[in-house]
Amino acid sequence: PELNTQFHATAHLNPLAMKTTTGDGKEVIERFRYSNDAVSSPLYGYKRIYNNDSTMTACSYSGQKPLIASTWNDKLQAYEDRLCHTYDSYGNVSSVTTDGRTYTCYLWSYCNQYPIAKIVNVTYDALLSALGKDKAWVEQLGNMTSPDTEMETINSLRQKLPEAQVYTYT
């Protein structure tokens, strides 16, 4: 395969386009658009073209944090959300959904620097409800230098939310 990369950006050194010629002579073209390229538009785009078939992905940002990643649907002629993020006040990911129905939530601690729990298949509101806690507790948990006293509470999710997968980190 032969790779040809195009650089025309002045604000960054990232590639704008890459063209690969496969062994059978077909071309795969990848085009990139970065948020630095259009300051007024917090959108990142990627387009891949192969055999007259294309895939387009767009990602909207809030500052440096990605919020929603969407993929173009040719049949609907619209973008479909594929990945949505929410963040805590420190910029840590608090929840992610890939389809609007399956959620993964995260709990942080050690002065908001490290995740201590990943809970799959539950919304953040359902997680807090099962624990009998509120967002103030999440803030306190995040600010702790050692969350040992709260790990029993977090581990209780395994019984309280049997449909969820609970991973804890120490």
Kindly give the residue locations of the regions a language model identified.
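Non-catalytic interaction/targeting regions
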Residues: 1-126, 130-170
